[in-house]
Amino acid sequence: QSIIYRHNAADLFLNKNDIENSNVQNYECILITGTSLAAEPSRSAVLYALELAKENNIPVIMDIDYRPYTWESADKAKQIYNLACDYCSGIIGNDDEFAILSGSYESGFNYAKKKSKNCELVIYKMGEKGSITFANNKEIKKGIFPVKPLKPTGAGDSFLGSLIGALLKKYDLQKAIEIGSAAAAIVVTKVGCAPAMPDLNEVLDFMKINNINKGDT
């Protein structure tokens, strides 16, 4: 059994001064998670960073990462997430998370698809059913690498980190998605989150002996 406890976590105390001292204008890309938007002062600090990113034409990728226990309400989460989305070049989340942004589960998919008109990359994840990626006016449907999981935590972080890492190493988008999916599959079979994160060589070795399925997209 895994227990996650977050109360007065250090990352939620990020403030505007931290951003000003970080030379954001020199970054090639900014990656944020929705957790940082859940409370002050980190919410205002991150929104300030997004403003600086926009001023300096720096792409922003957001992992929605909605955790109900960190927000005062779903309505507040919807408001702040949508504000942040206006700055994003990429948005990544699962079906439940896009439901928060759109207001209902039924409208989440169409919301994601609509956002892709203004974003370079939108990934709509569906757990065991795989994912649908919207990019370059195309839809990329991918399944998962079936495994016997020990726990669900860490899958989203490993997917995103490995996806972005693969893109930076010049893998094409379809391959990068598969690498992210493989990393997620590896993490859920191990104890812990950060200690379970694989490096690229481990992911590629895993992909040599495991096949991605067609999903249910």
Regions found by a protein language model. Give the residues of each.
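Structural alpha-helical scaffold elements that stabilize or flank donor/cofactor-binding regions
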Residues: 22-23, 83-84, 115
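Alpha-helix C-terminal capping/helix-to-coil transition sites in glycosyltransferase folds
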Residues: 25-26, 86-87, 118
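Glycine-rich phosphate/pyrophosphate-binding beta-alpha loops
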Residues: 9, 34-38, 184, 190-193
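Conserved phosphate-binding/catalytic region of the ribokinase-like
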Residues: 51, 55, 105-217
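Conserved N-terminal subdomain of the carbohydrate kinase-like
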Residues: 1-32, 203-217
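Acidic, amphipathic alpha-helical patches
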Residues: 20, 81, 149
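Conserved beta-alpha-beta core of the PfkB/ribokinase-like small-molecule kinase fold
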Residues: 29, 35-110, 129-131
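Residues that scaffold the ATP/ADP-binding catalytic core of kinase and kinase-like folds
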Residues: 3, 28, 40, 101, ...
